[in-house]
Amino acid sequence: MSHGMTRYQTLASPHGLDDQTALDHYCYAVAGVVGEMLTALFIAYRPSLQAQREELAALSVSFGLGLQLTNILKDVWDDAKRGVCWWPQTLVSKQGIVWPPRGNPTLIASRQELVAIAHGHLRDALEYTLAIPAEEQGLRQFCLWAIGMAVLTLQKIQHSNAYLTGHNVKITRRAVRNVILGCRVTGRYDRGLRLLFAWWSRGLACQRRCSRQLYQTVSCW
């Protein structure tokens, strides 16, 4: 993780990363590897999860990418102010938007594809969480709160036409409380959790990717 973060700090620029693959590797270096570490800890704590190690490892990387992509979308303008952008140049080029993003609100037109990708990863994150036994509520809630807050943040991003700082799309304290309450009420019931997250993510664009293929591409393990 430290090696990856150091590498990308030296590559940081206002011109964005080369392509989606480069973005995947960046998100893995700063977040996906954390998912792998937590999975190892969860399995050590709950040995019965060992049988699902490969599936959980793949989904854990997707989980981390979903959270990190949400942060990248939320903080795009704050990053731009310090001369950094993590969006892929290929996406910006496809949308016909001038780069770099400073002072260029039309860049928001290219966010939809990244929102869809992030949402797809967060769906994998939910599947990861549902693989944890329902009686392990501490582990489940730890994951669910992060996913719920990320989904609601994506909703704000998708429906904000001209946000210029991460603060503009930050979810409210009331929304945070609702996430915690909703997850506590439904945390033991897979069907209830699926319905809850379907409601929170209604209307969100979604692009699913193969978590196993992504894992094989970016993972260092």
Predicted regions and their residues:
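Single, functionally critical "micro-switch" positions that shape active/binding sites
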Residues: 74
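Catalytic cores of Mg2+-dependent Asp-rich isoprenoid enzymes
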Residues: 1-66, 77-221
